[in-house]
Amino acid sequence: MKLSAVAGRYARAFLNIAIENEKEDEYLRFLDFVCNVYESNKDLFDNPVVKPEKKVTLIKSVLEEFGEEMDEFQERFLMLLFERKRQKLLRNIHELFEYEKILSEQKVPADLRIAHVPKEEELTLLRKFIRKYALKDPVFKTTVDESLIAGAVVEFEGFRLDTTVQGRLKRLSQETLKRGEMS
């Protein structure tokens, strides 16, 4: 997914409000909910005939059906997005908000691709490894990828650790090719 600079500005501004009100987790859940509502009704929310006020009111009513409320900052944030026709950036804003939230907590985001659902002892080892190099606690975004056969791939702060069978085979074939070229 391509992340835009505009989405970054919206995400940081919304996170600053969330931090000020000590509602970071609540605002993250709100963004996730709004993204899902928007993505399931894109035709309606992208329709220029429907006024921004109506779109925000609709999201507010859906939130209320799920027992949630929208505060004034969330409402103004959505109104701004719809007035400026930036609703297509909602998923990017959500992703960047989540990323910036992790950084604001003095943690490091880490992508974990693993062949199976990770066990707690595996996560503990990976946490220790990342703490050693990043000097921060990791927050994992885990993806199960059965094509990896076994092992895991962890990426954080520009580093990549690949312990998969697939990765080992790839490195082995590259080494073999290098040796073949040198002979």
From Swiss-Prot:
Q: Which domain of life is it from?
A: Bacteria
Report the membrane topology from the UniProt record.
Answer: Peripheral membrane protein
A Pfam family hit: OSCP
Keyword Glycoprotein in annotation = no
Keyword tags: ATP synthesis, Cell inner membrane, Cell membrane, CF(1), Hydrogen ion transport, Ion transport, Membrane, Transport
Drop me one GO molecular function for this one.
proton-transporting ATP synthase activity, rotational mechanism
- What GO cellular component entries does it have? plasma membrane; proton-transporting ATP synthase complex
Compartments, record wording: Cell inner membrane
InterPro entries from the UniProt entry: ATP_synth_OSCP/delta_N_sf, ATPase_OSCP/dsu
Looking at the UniProt entry, the stretches that span the membrane are none
Main localization is: membrane
The record's note on quaternary structure and interaction partners says: F-type ATPases have 2 components, F(1) - the catalytic core - and F(0) - the membrane proton channel. F(1) has five subunits: alpha(3), beta(3), gamma(1), delta(1), epsilon(1). F(0) has three main subunits: a(1), b(2) and c(10-14). The alpha and beta chains form an alternating ring which encloses part of the gamma chain. F(1) is attached to F(0) by a central stalk formed by the gamma and epsilon chains, while a peripheral stalk is formed by the delta and b chains.
Q: Which NCBIfam families match?
A: ATP_synt_delta (TIGR01145), PRK13441.1 (NF009976)
Report the protein's function.
F(1)F(0) ATP synthase produces ATP from ADP in the presence of a proton or sodium gradient. F-type ATPases consist of two structural domains, F(1) containing the extramembraneous catalytic core and F(0) containing the membrane proton channel, linked together by a central stalk and a peripheral stalk. During catalysis, ATP synthesis in the catalytic domain of F(1) is coupled via a rotary mechanism of the central stalk subunits to proton translocation. This protein is part of the stalk that links CF(0) to CF(1). It either transmits conformational changes from CF(0) to CF(1) or is implicated in proton conduction.
Per the record, the similarity remark reads: Belongs to the ATPase delta chain family.
HAMAP family named among the record's database cross-references = ATP_synth_delta_bact
Question: What name does the UniProt record give this protein?
Answer: ATP synthase subunit delta
